[in-house]
Amino acid sequence: MTTHQLTQLTRTLVQVAMGKIPADTVIRNGRWVCVQSGEIIPNTDIAIKDGRIAFVGADVSHTLGKQTNVINAGDRYLVPGLLDGHMHVESGMVTVTEFVRAVILHGTTGMFIDPHEIANVFGLKGVRLMVDEAAVQPIHVWVQMPSCVPSAPGLETPGASIGPQEVAEAMKWEGIIGLGEMMNFPGVMNADEKMHAEMAETRSAGKVVGGHYASLELGKEFHGYVAGGPEDDHEGTRVEDAVARVRQGMKVMMRLGSAWHDVASQIRAITEMGFDPRHFILCTDDSHSETLINQGHMDRVVSHAITQGINPITAIQLATINPAEHFGVAREVGMIAPGRYADILLISSLPKFEVEMVIAKGQIAAQNGKLLMDIPAFPYPTWAVSSVNLGRELTARDFRLTAPVSSGKVKAHIIGVIENQAPTQHLVMEVNVVKGEVSPDIERDILKVALVERHKGTGEVQVGLVNGFGLDQPCAIATTVAHDSHHMIVVGTSDSDMAIAANKLGQVGGGQVVVLDGEVIGMVELPIAGLMSNERAELVAEKASGILEAFRTCGCTLNNPNMQLSLLALVVIPELRISDLGLVDVNEFDFVPVLES
């Protein structure tokens, strides 16, 4: 906003507050949840003009005009619109527009998004695409410039790369709020010049450096990471993680997404240890479309926090004023107060936290779960829907795992999936060798996992082993949503089904697919960067539900298997991952063999 525009805005708001010109909309007879003071103030009225709040007080009569729209709150709570402190739109497998369409029903009026998924596919032009789409939304969508593309140089090959020069360019763009999660924590604590230059460009622009410390180690490595400059972190899973971060000056982002459930463990720092809640923020990180449609978004997170014993007002603060102050936008959002955007929720019960009306930027956006505004689709360019390039037709032979011996047993390094958590285990187990090959061992839940290069058409396939998916049929599951470089991941019990699954995704331009005994039994097409659908969120959720059902048919009982599948190549979260270059021990940031000689 220019100086002239801001001058005109504040002059107008003053005139409404003084009763000299009428408000566009007033809300009467509500219970004001004043997050800035921690009070609930009854009998409150609010006057709104040009999408902003002009007056909050006991009587708004002096702001009424003949054309003023009057909303009777009926003694319901007036809650600031909810903010998601850290999230990735691409995890919903829908566009920014469709994500907004889904979450606005649940009271989300602002999101801080890190589009490092599309950045790994398209680089800076992919980020620009997301910034442009974010700018035309009916809610606030701030973009963090992705920091680690690739997330681990030398351990993976991305479709694109980003460095200090690109970060410096993006910091000039309107809509860029800061630097996305600094996932290369070894790079930070080992004083890597590129990582520190990116953080320096961000801080020079006066913006926030996002953190990502995915290690359980809280000794000198953690202290070294914090000294490097990251200002928040959402990777904590234990109360001691929250304690350490707050004591070292970081904001603790507690996440409840589709697969990550880290609020209950860390909120104990507030409820049991008496830590100042100002240093805590709620977020989702990754939410699938079916979670958004069937369970909700930030309303779900706030409600969950309340069930963990935190005061409802405090829970709301963690999703409103806290993230707003952290990112430096509290003059615009995060509270119900003059000058701020009129992002207001009407709710009958705080403990239940069921959103009945959503006002976004002064407009009634949703009521009782129904969208009341039109949100036009964003036109994606042709280049954004042609990103999957396998280079050739894959066959069952590409998914063989050749052993160093012709028969007997060998020690194998196996990725161990942990239910509801992002980290994996580095398992070392003996596996059987028959005719020079290692095959899946269904009884012990040892399956094949393959990483298929899909950006440059090299035809390269890396094969390893994984435990935890529980597949017990001749089948395969595959996805091009494969954090962070977003190649293609395939897990299966059958080499031929793994080839069918991979080739199918190559044909449709990306997505997720389940193949059972040679037949496709579930699929969601994701043609935009191989990450997002161009269809409505409800349809994507329906297809995603079909994928989950197909997982179950194949024997998988994980709570959120497609999310766990998508993280098998995330070589910045311990302990063991697979990349297009081999099997990676994340703790050592080095390669290990799948099979020992």
Where are these regions (language model features)?
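Active-site microenvironment of metallo-dependent hydrolases
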Residues: 1-44, 48-54, 59, 104-106, ...
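Divalent-metal coordination cores built from histidine and acidic residues
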Residues: 2-17, 21-22, 97-208, 273-275, ...
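Short coil/turn connectors at secondary-structure junctions
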Residues: 21-23, 65-68, 73-74, 78, ...
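Residue-level marker for buried hydrophobic side chains located in beta-strands
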Residues: 26, 81-83, 209, 282, ...
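Active-site beta-loop-alpha junctions enriched in small/polar residues
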Residues: 88-90, 116-118, 146-151, 182-185, ...
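A generic structural signal for well-ordered alpha-helical segments
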Residues: 103, 134, 202-203, 225, ...
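Histidine/acidic residue-rich metal-binding segments in metalloenzymes
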Residues: 126, 161-181, 187-254, 261-282, ...
